[in-house]
């Protein structure tokens, strides 16, 4: 069984964004083989299915990238023939927004490690937690000139909108903020290191779909939250980011989709999912309209395939690939 290699700062920080999507087929065979030993948990709610659906599409497009997806507990047994990626359980924002939830995450990591089949990589897949249930409201943020939105089910102050940091609690009435999630991931990373558990936790950005968020205050504050995650990760080169949002805001032709919020006459742009990434494929991988979201991941197959390609790149980097022709160890 392969042990996850801790990424080395000297070879560049691991950030899987739109710039790496087309590099999935540059991965040397030895690192493709290494990824095929990995057990990956991308736990979340409906949006987490995009991580699985894309992998099945990639395997169909190119059988080099063998995969087994799962939504079962226990997850699949060890194999060196295919990447194992899925979620053994549903996970909502309460997992990071409450002490009890964070305790359960740590316990789940430890319990899986005790089976001898540890998770190699784990991450929390955001749903619409940054935007839904509580629309923009509360007191205007004097720095960013927005009102915050979002849900915090299971948090100490209840289900309320939330901002970026503790200081925003006076604006939202909620002690939960984006820093709650970021500090929670850091805490799980320390927990794994302290107990010598070979599980690498990563950070994730969240969804950029949702028509009501397109060109709105809700979408603009969502982008601020994503940028806050990116800044946190950039502050420590050992942190790893899967930039779900950025991957989906760009299409396969290298075009970024930007929406415009008309804030009382001031145009304030924010990134939004590219319409191409809401499209599907036919059997020959020609792009077609998505009739309905039958797979339940809220994005099209075009977007899901982009996620899968970026995931293989990231996992190969975690396994020791330097992103070029060499190894980090």
What residues fall within each predicted segment?
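Substrate-gating cap/lid alpha-helix
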Residues: 206-253
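N-terminal module-boundary/linker segments of secreted carbohydrate-active enzymes
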Residues: 11-68, 77, 297-301, 316-326
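Bacterial N-terminal signal peptides
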Residues: 1-7
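Histidine-centered active-site loop/cap adjacent to the catalytic His
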Residues: 241, 264-326
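A structural motif corresponding to the C-terminal end of an alpha-helix
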Residues: 184-201, 228-241, 317, 321
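The substrate-binding groove and active-site-proximal loops of carbohydrate-active enzymes
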Residues: 160-181, 214-219, 298-301
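Loop/turn elements at helix/coil->beta-strand transitions in domains of secreted/extracellular proteins
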Residues: 36-39, 62-67, 116-123, 194-202, ...
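Conserved SGNH/GDSL esterase-like catalytic core that processes O-acyl groups on lipids
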Residues: 47-171
